């Protein structure tokens, strides 16, 4: 989609970077333009009228003027600020994490309304749900699928035989779960029958349905190990927000 000289777009602020003494470069995920960059002049000044509308994971209608190298933010009006998330360290860390993933998995200026809607729905759920960890797992699994990295969960990703009801192995390199026989030639993380069932259920259902799941801490830990390994393999690095999330978990905050 070609941008006019002056344009408005709905956007979620997924990253902000300091620039100069008072400016910022904003990464904006939009439904119609994909990931775009915006220069926000003087937004870090205390008297800036825009600063409150351009916070991280804020959902706003943003006005921009097209530039040669980067577009300039000329106005912004908040649509949703997600106050419940902002009042909780744990929820804020999760919101930072899903925004970081959305940033890495969204190519610049290539519209992907499905990823935009997934991120928006996830932020809305985090702002209201009591099952934030499950909500985050839903986001991770569906983001991988929308980005072309859907893990194989029904058959061995290596030999393509139907998986048996036994301990199998999650292998990002192979593209999903592998059977014990293929584990002899491939690396993989042990994953239980129940954890595989939960992964399948999350992958195949909408977000309201996943709250029916009753998952213990052991299963959540298995899911976390497998999904993190998959994301790390795709990105070839660890998302920075995980450091904050893990530190909060260790402190039981």
UniProtKB/Swiss-Prot annotation:
Gene3D superfamilies reported in the protein's UniProt record: Nucleic acid-binding proteins, Recombination protein O, C-terminal domain
Keyword S-adenosyl-L-methionine: no
One cellular component term from this protein's GO annotations in UniProt: bacterial nucleoid
SUPFAM superfamilies recorded: ArfGap/RecO-like zinc finger (SSF57863), Nucleic acid-binding proteins (SSF50249)
Protein name according to UniProt: DNA repair protein RecO
NCBIfam families, per database record: reco
Alphabetical list of InterPro entries matching this protein: ARFGAP/RecO, DNA_rep/recomb_RecO_N, NA-bd_OB-fold, RecO, RecO_C
Similarity annotation: Belongs to the RecO family.
Keywords: DNA damage, DNA recombination, DNA repair
Disulfide bond entries: none
Domain of life the protein comes from: Bacteria
Function: Involved in DNA repair and RecF pathway recombination.
GO BP field: DNA recombination; double-strand break repair
């Amino acid at each position: 989609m070609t941008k006019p000289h002056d344009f408005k777009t709905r956007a979620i602020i997924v990253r902000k970077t300091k620039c100069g003494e008072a400016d910022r470069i904003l990464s904006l995920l939009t439904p119609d333009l994909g990931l775009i960059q915006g220069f926000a002049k003087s937004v870090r000044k205390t008297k800036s009228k825009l600063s409150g509308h351009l916070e991280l994971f804020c959902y706003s209608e943003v006005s921009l003027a097209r530039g040669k190298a980067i577009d300039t933010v000329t106005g912004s009006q908040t649509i949703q600020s997600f106050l419940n998330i902002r009042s909780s360290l744990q929820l804020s860390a999760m919101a930072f994490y899903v925004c970081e993933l959305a940033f890495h998995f969204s190519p610049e200026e290539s519209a992907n309304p499905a990823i935009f809607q997934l991120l928006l729905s996830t932020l809305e759920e985090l702002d209201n749900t009591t099952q934030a960890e499950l909500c985050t797992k839903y986001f991770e699994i569906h983001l991988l699928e929308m980005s072309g990295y859907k893990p194989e969960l029904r058959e061995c990703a290596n030999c393509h035989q139907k998986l048996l009801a036994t301990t199998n192995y999650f292998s990002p390199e192979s593209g999903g779960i592998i059977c014990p026989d293929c584990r002899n030639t491939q690396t993989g993380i042990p994953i239980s029958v129940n954890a595989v069932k939960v992964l399948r259920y999350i992958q195949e259902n909408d977000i309201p349905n996943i709250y029916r799941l009753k998952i213990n801490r052991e299963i959540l830990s298995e899911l976390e190990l497998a999904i993190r390994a998959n994301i790390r393999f795709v990105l070839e690095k660890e998302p920075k927000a995980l450091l904050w999330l893990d530190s909060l978990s260790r402190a039981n905050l």
